[in-house]
């Protein structure tokens, strides 16, 4: 009996010990689980912690870096140098400093939209000679010069809209660059924010020379007259001063009539209009709007200094345009855009100025290779005097290293070809006129 009692007591003691030990075991297991859970939960925090590398991936065999919305203020040093595309949109970058991207020499596209960029230093894009796409829209850029883009000769797509552009003399070179015909995808939709007189004007359409010329500003905004007398209204020039010929083609001859402007009421069926040897020093918008059948227009020897971009609006059938022996230094962007069927363009004996503003005329002629022209020779500045405009433009780009030059037509000079063409054309014209005279006789 004693043995049975001892055995029962031992069982109760063992059970009591197990009961005491079990809560501790549960707590230890719980604590262990919490510790393990804490370690597992720390991984996502590290993944999104600031300072860690951005997403780098390859798509269609091209390497991308995606660092969007990371509150970055600068380029991180650990990024791969063989990147082809860099996405840095929606960050906090305020300044693009010199050599900021110089080690990414293979970069093709750079997305910097929706940052806080207000300043771009002159060598910020140094080394990006393969860059084709640059997105700078939705920033705080007010002033920028063409100098910034010297190191991106292959740039084909540039977005600048939704920036508070301050359209003054400081951005004149940028506007001139955007208005070159080959740059048709650079700076589209970008508009001036200030000053008030330029607000909402597109950078690609604004006249760059008006940004710096105070005299033209006074002409656009004349001061009110002090005198109480009404302004003198000069009579409009009427086309009845000119001679109208029907044979061999409908011709209006206004040659040597001392005209100071294009006459009104030009018959709409006129095919040839001769306004040479007058005193018309500028062509206003829509001067020939109603002369839809016009094919030959002679404006030589007038002293023309300025042609409004809309002056030739409506001349969709014009084939010959003579602007020789005037005072033209360059063409504003858009002057020739309506001349779809132009074949002959006479430009000799004008004081062509070889600077950035001459590029529009030259590249328009290169793009419209079926248009024969002559006389495109530099008169100023002195260092380029006597050069063909093609030679000047080639030298303009030769100042850059050869590996940074954009792809342009191999042939820039057309002088010899133009001289031969002009001689043949004059001989051919003389023969045609002699035949006509013989028939009339």
UniProtKB/Swiss-Prot annotation:
Q: GO biological process annotations for this chain's record?
A: bone marrow development; negative regulation of osteoclast differentiation; ossification
- One Pfam match, given by its short name, reads LRR_8
Question: LRR repeat boundaries?
Answer: 82-103, 106-127, 130-151, 269-290, 293-314, 317-340
- Is Glycoprotein among this UniProt entry's keywords? no
PROSITE patterns membership: LRR
UniProt GO cellular component terms = extracellular matrix; extracellular space
InterPro entries attached here? Cys-rich_flank_reg_C (IPR000483), Leu-rich_rpt (IPR001611), Leu-rich_rpt_typical-subtyp (IPR003591), LRR_dom_sf (IPR032675), LRR_TM_domain-containing (IPR050541)
Task: Name the keywords, alphabetized.
Answer: Leucine-rich repeat, Osteogenesis, Repeat, Secreted, Signal
Give residue ranges for domain LRRCT: 163-214, 350-402
Q: Which residues form the LRRNT domain?
A: 225-268
Q: What is its main location?
A: secreted
Tissue specificity, please?
A: Expressed in osteoblast cell lines. Well expressed in ovary, heart, pancreas, skeletal muscle, lung, and fetal kidney and lung and only at the basal levels in the other tissues examined including adult kidney. More expressed in S-type neuroblastoma cells than in N-type neuroblastoma cells.
Signal peptide location: 1-18
The listed locations are: Secreted, Extracellular space
Quick check: keyword Signal in the entry? yes
Function recorded in the entry: Involved in bone homeostasis. Acts as a negative regulator of RANKL-induced osteoclast precursor differentiation from bone marrow precursors.
The identity of this protein, by name, is Leucine-rich repeat-containing protein 17
The top of its lineage is: Eukaryota, Metazoa, Chordata, Craniata, Vertebrata
Q: Which gene encodes it?
A: LRRC17
